[in-house]
Amino acid sequence: AYEVENSGTCIRRGCVYNVKETASKIKRLILKLENKLGGTKIGQVYVGLGGQSLRSIEHTVCKVLGTEGVVTEEIIDSLYQECKDYRPDMLTVLDVVSPSYFLDDKPESNPVGVPCSRIEARYKLIVGRPSLKLNIVNSISEQAKIEIAGILVSPLALGDVVLSDNEKDLGCALIGFGAGVTTISVYKGGKLASLSVVPFGGNLITKDITNLRVVESEAERLKITYGSAKADRDNDMTIQVSLADGMGLREIKLAELNGVIEARMDEILENVYARLEATGLMSVLGAGIVITGGGAALKNLPAVMSERLKMEVRYSAVRKGVVASGDLVVASLSLIHISEPTRPISIS
C-alpha cells in the first residue's frame, strides 16, 4: 500500500523547513496507510534523505604496513573505522560509499591477502548540512513520535533500483528531476564517483506557468498534460485553462505555455550540464545518461538533453526485474530495496 500527502511549503528544496507541519503530515500519512492495511499498526519507518546541501566529498585514509606487510580484514576494518570517525567542518557525514584501494600506489579491487608496504583507501563521503538530518529526526521521532528504523540517502537508494550493475560499471549518470531539487549521481567502475544537487526542480516550472494567470494547481495540470521541454513556436494550437475563480474557461496558446517551460528547463539543464562536466567523466560514460523522477517525464526532455550532450539519454523508472508503477512508488520502492541488506544512517 502507498499513500501521498502534499508537502505544501513544509518541505523546501528537498529539506524539512517546518518541523511541526511536517510531523502533522507524516502522522496523517501513517493513519491513511494503517487504514489501508486493515488497521495494522506501523511501528517503524525508513526515511529517504535528500536536499539542497547533499553532495559527495573525497576522503583518503592511509596505513603503512612495512616491508613485510600483508593486507588483512582487520586492516580494512581499521581504515573504515578511521574514515567513519572523520568529521568535516560544518557538515554531517550521512553515508560512506565503498572505497577504491591502492596498494603501493597501484589500484586493487580485492586487497585482502595481498602483500604491500602501504595501503590507501579512497572513500566517497555523502555529506550535508547538520539540519538536513536533524530536522527529519525532529519532525518524525520527536514531534510525530514515530520510531525511525533508518535514514537512507535517497539518490543512492534510487540508483540501486534504477541502474543495473553493468551501467554502473560502464559509467552512467543518473539524474533525478524532483519537485524541489535536481540530483546528479555519476557512477564509474561500479562505484559512485560523484553526487551533487542543483537547487532547482519542477516546482519552479509550475510557478512560472502561474504567470500565465492560472492558479498553481491548474499550472501543474498544464505542465503534466501539455508540457514539453522544447517549444514549437510555429504551432498555433490553443488549449483551455480554468479561470482563477474556477467558474469558467479561457484559451492560451500551446506555444506560449511551452515557451515558459522551455526557458526554465534550459536554466535547470545548464546547471546540470555544468555539474556533469565538473566531474571530468563525461567522456567515459559508456552507458550514457538515465533520467528519472516526476520532472523527467516532461515531453521531449531526453531528446533535448541528448542533442546538447551528444550521448544517449533515456527515461527510466526502474531496471528490469523490479516491478513498480509511477515515480512516487519507485521512490518508495528504492528505500525498501536498499533497506534489506541495509546501511541505514545512525539516528543517535
PLM-predicted stretches and their roles:
Residues G202-L212:
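A conserved active-site cap/scaffold subdomain adjacent to cofactor or substrate pockets
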Residues L49, S228-A231, V284-R308:
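Glycine-rich phosphate-binding loops at beta-strand->alpha-helix junctions
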Residues A1-A173, K191-L192, G202, V215-S217, ...:
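Nucleotide/phosphate-binding catalytic cleft detector across ATP-hydrolyzing
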Residues R275-S283, A287-G294, E312-V323:
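Hydrophobic alpha-helical bundle architecture
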Residues V47, I140-S141, G176, I209, ...:
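Residue-level signature of catalytic and energy-coupling elements of molecular machines
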Residues L49-G50, L174-V181, Y187-G190, P199-N203, ...:
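A short acidic Gly-Thr/Ser loop motif
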Residues R314-S339, R343-S348:
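Glycine-rich phosphate-binding/hydrolytic loop that grips phosphoryl groups
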